[in-house]
Swiss-Prot record:
This is Endo-1,4-beta-xylanase B. GO terms for molecular function: endo-1,4-beta-xylanase activity. It comes from Humicola insolens. Its main location: secreted. Residues 40-352 form the GH10 domain. It is found in: Secreted. Keywords: Carbohydrate metabolism, Glycoprotein, Glycosidase, Hydrolase, Polysaccharide degradation, Secreted, Signal, Xylan degradation. Glycans are attached at residue 136. Residues 1-17 form the signal peptide. Considering the detergent and textile solutions that are neutral to alkaline and must be tolerant to high temperatures and SDS, the three xylanases XynA, XynB and XynC having such favorable properties might represent potential candidates in the detergent and textile industries. Together with their wide substrate specificities, the XynA, XynB and XynC thermophilic xylanases could also be of considerable commercial interest in various other industries, especially in the brewing industry. GO terms for biological process: xylan catabolic process.
Amino acid sequence: MRFSASLLLALTGSAAASPIRAEEEIRVYDLPISLFDDLQGLDAAMKAAGREYIGTSLTVRNDFQEQNIIRTEFGSITPENAQKWDATEPNRGQFTFGSADQHMDWARQNGKHVRCHTLVWYSQLPGWVSNSGFNNATLQQVMQNHINQVMGRYRGRCNHWDVVNEAPRLMAMRLQIGEAYIPIAFRMAAQADPSAKLYYNDYNLEYLGPKVEGAARIVRLVKQYGARIDGVGYQAHLVTEPTPTQSTPTPSEEDLIKALRITADLGVDVAYTEIDIRMRTPSNAQKLQQLADAYYRVARSCMKVPRCVGMTIWGVTDRYSWVPNTFRGEGDALLWDSNYQRKAAYNAFLRGIQEPVN
């Protein structure tokens, strides 16, 4: 079975602060950051609200400040690159787990939940897969072996797995296997680690329209094949303002909620999996306030959708963010600046988690 034209179109497109009286007419995230020093961290606030985790992507490096923030603020890590296909199986049948093991060991030593990432993705895919010319049967064998080896090594240690990432762009699988490669991958993953929650993960799902509807169709497709899919990851690589690479700013809280519900209403969990909200640089006070407002909207939308189980920020500090090297002239996308100082966006995000849901 091949991708239908309509599917392709769809896819390519708590210890809280003292109460603040209403008459004070101030927003929590306008307060000096020092006033928040004794508050619970982000993950503790999320758990106090009855959800699973607040996480960050992780690249293990010798940076005490970054690691200390992760230990105190985050309950979950996502290996940023260490579990991708090119890192784990650079040559057919030759597996290298050194970096992935390091990340998994760090998580275990520090008591962190792990979102393992990612099994089947068009990018960071070795040429021996993408340019192989394998037929349908061989490609399925390759996918089966890769999933079995990688998931099997970390069986029982991954809370969530991103099984398929950005499905419509994976031409190697699509051209030979057709759209069936998606449910096939989920079926293989469920057999390799029955305890892990299995996710489809994609970008631009936060905007109402063909992309999120395409993700919903993938959920239905996997279920129609009798395979298990537990959740949809909304990457949330967003912007505060129109930029050369993204014309539409972070949606309103209401539209974010609607977008999450499009897949959550199909009986799966949802999560924000790779949050960063970039702007044109350099930043200024107004832009940083827009950043705070956007992070607040994202947090509130998750808290207002019962099946939104967690949120992962794609990095801790702007010092190491992937954004400036990928989107020229854009950046300042995270909660801590390059000097490890919390931005107003941190307080806004925390407030978005802590505020009661009406």
